[in-house]
From Swiss-Prot:
Enzyme Commission designation: 2.5.1.145
Function of the protein: Catalyzes the transfer of the diacylglyceryl group from phosphatidylglycerol to the sulfhydryl group of the N-terminal cysteine of a prolipoprotein, the first step in the formation of mature lipoproteins.
Keyword Transcription part of the UniProt annotation: no
Main location: membrane
Subcellular location: Cell membrane
The family this protein is said to belong to: Belongs to the Lgt family.
Keywords assigned by UniProt, alphabetized: Cell membrane, Membrane, Transferase, Transmembrane, Transmembrane helix
GO molecular function: phosphatidylglycerol-prolipoprotein diacylglyceryl transferase activity
Pathway: Protein modification; lipoprotein biosynthesis (diacylglyceryl transfer)
Protein name: Phosphatidylglycerol--prolipoprotein diacylglyceryl transferase
Binding site for a 1,2-diacyl-sn-glycero-3-phospho-(1'-sn-glycerol): R138
Amino acid sequence: MLLGSVPQLDRVAIQLGPFPVYWYGIIIGTGVLLGLWLATREGERLGIPKDTFVDLVLIAVPIAILFARMYYVIFEWEYYAQNPSQIINIRQGGLAIHGGLIGAVITGILFAKRRGVSFWKLADIAAPSILLGQAIGRWGNFMNQEAHGDEVTRQFLEGLHLPDFIINQMYIDGVYYHPTFLYESLWNFAGVILLLALRKVNLRRGELFFTYLIWYSVGRFFVEGLRTDSLMLGPLRIAQVMSIGLVVISIIFIIVRRKMGQADKRYLEN
């Protein structure tokens, strides 16, 4: 697709008759599948049956998407109150990661209780997978030309030594923008490497998951400050408030669980 003289990628991957298949959905699906593969592989190593994470994903992903959409709609209610037919339209994006995370955690707790397994063990195993899915999923925002930052010049983007296809896709309505999707994606990929390395340290159970929350939240806080489409509550950027909250809560949980003797088991223990 061309916009002016700048070639750009089409957000529609293929057309199946009258039905367009968007890159956004394909990329999100790819992130889920790769994350599932990573979790099932590690789960089997730690004695978790392969179908456990398959079953969890089949339940958790739809619920996470529902919560992600609800979260987004709630903070954009002024628009959706006037356009209720758009509430269920997620083809163009509009999924808030923090909402999805809330839905996934609630589902994980209930699932673990029903299966009679430790939620913290499942959460630790899943942590790198979740972050991998988020790292990949940000490229869906890239295809949709959303979740970008403030205006910049082409020279600025070229100075980052980015490939032309990224620079061109950041050209929206005659203006170049910060590729904040890329900053967050790279931060998340680095986090995946960190979490995989920390598996070998044999942390106390639950602390790998809290490390994920802290790592993601720190990166999201700074990237959010560059974005122009932040969900707001008065003068506050909701994602930044949530990020600070998750860091504080994670640190408190780590300290309290250790002091109360609730973190005696290690990651590698069955």
